[in-house]
Amino acid sequence: MRLQYKTTTKYLFFSLPFYLMLFACGLQITDVEYALREAGENRGELEAVLSHYAKLDDRQKLEAAQYLIRYMPYHTSYDKGIEDYYHAIDSVVALSEDKLEQEKHIESLRLRFESKYKQKRDIEVITSEFLIQSIDEAFKQWRECEWAEHLDFEQFCEYLLPYKCFEGQPLTEWRNAYYDICKGDIDLAYLCDEYKRNPIFAATEVNNQMKNTPQSFGLLKTLPIYDPDIILKLPFSNCATYCLGAVLIMRSKGIPVAYDFTPNWSTGNNGHSWNTVYTTRFGNLEFAPHTTDPGTVHYPYLKVPKIFRNVYKPNEEYLKIATEKYIPPKLRNMFIRDVTAEYMPTIDIRIPLQESLKSGQSPFIAIYDGNNWTPVYWGKIAGSHVVFERMGLNTCYIALAYDSNGNAIPI
C-alpha cells in the first residue's frame, strides 16, 4: 500500500494542472485534455475513442467516454502476467481436496509470483478497441438489460460503465468472461412479471448460486485476485475478496452491485466489507455474498463510524490531501465515496482548534480499536474549527493531526 501511495503521489506532483477548453459535439471537456496529455504516446488511442463516438452522434456514449478518460490518469492495472498466478492456483486446488494442504501451496505461490506482478498506468496502455468495446457492452447492459434500466446516467457511470471494477484489475474482457458464472435462471426472468426488471431477484438468484460453492472464511495470504472463478475455488478467504468476486460476477450480468466497507468497526480492531444492489424502489440494499440476500440488515448490532463505497471516480477531497500531506495507511484509497448517510443518521462533528495546524499537518478523526486510536476519516478546516462530516453516532472519537512523517498529535 505504501509503495502504491508514493507512486500515485508522484504522478500528482509532476503532472502540472492546467485547464484547456475544448468542444466536441457541443460538449465541454476541459479535464479530458489533461488526461490526453498524460497519455503520452498513447494519446492517439484515446482520441480515436472520442472521435468514434463523435462521428456516431451518440451524445451519451461520448459523455461516457469523456467520463472514463477524464479520471483514467489516476488508475493502474496489473498486466496479463497475473494470469499465470491464477493458473498455478487452479492447479494446486485440483491436486488436493485438503484445504490446509491447499493453503500451504497457495501461500508458497505468492512468494514465487510476487515479482511478476507489474502495474501500468491505464492511460498509457489502454487501446481504443478495448475501451470502445467496453463502453458499448456497458450501454447494452443499461439500455437492454432489465436489471439496470432504472439507473440514471450518473448512476450508470458509477455502477456499470467502468471498464474495470477494482483498482489493479487487468484490462480484459471481463463481462463476457464472467457472464456464465453463477448466473442461475436469471435469463428466464422475462417469463415472470414479478422477476423481470427486478434487480433484487437477479442479485438473489446469483447469490444463491454462489452459496452452492463451498466457501470458508479465514486468513489466506495471496496476491490480489480479480478472477471470480479462482476466488470461488480458494479453500478460504476473507470478506473483502468474496465481495470483490461478487461485484465482478454480478456486474458482468448488468446487475448494479457495489462494494461497500467500513475501515473499522466503532468498537473493534478490524473493518468489514459487504455488497449492495441498487434497486428500483428501495435504493441500495446490502447483502453478504455467499451468506445473506439483499434486504437482510447487515450486522445491525454493530456500530460503524464511517462507510465508503468503492467507485471509479477518484475522491477530490482525498486528492487535495494526498498531494501535500500525510494520509494514514488504512485510508490510502482514493477511489471511495462516503455513503455513511445512506445507512444511518449522521452528525457533523465540529471541534475548536486551540491553535492553527502547522504546515504539512492534516486533521483526522479516530476511534479506539482496543489497542490504538485508528483514523477513519479526514477533516476540513473551517476558520478556527475543524469539521468531520457525516460521522456515525454512538461512537467514541478523538481528533488527531498527522505530520508529514506520520506522527499523530491530538488536536
Residues covered by each model-derived region:
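Edge beta-strands of extracellular beta-sandwich domains
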Residues: 405-411
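Short Pro-Gly-centered beta-turn/loop motif in secreted/extracellular proteins
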Residues: 385-405
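A short, amphipathic beta-strand motif
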Residues: 347-355
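Short, ordered, surface-exposed loop/turn motifs in non-cytosolic proteins
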Residues: 356-372
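Hydrophobic/aromatic-rich core segments of domains that either
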Residues: 31-33, 54-55, 189-209, 218-229, ...
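Short, acidic Ser/Thr/Gly-rich low-complexity loop/linker segments typical of extracellular
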Residues: 371-385
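Secondary-structure boundary elements
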Residues: 48, 59-234
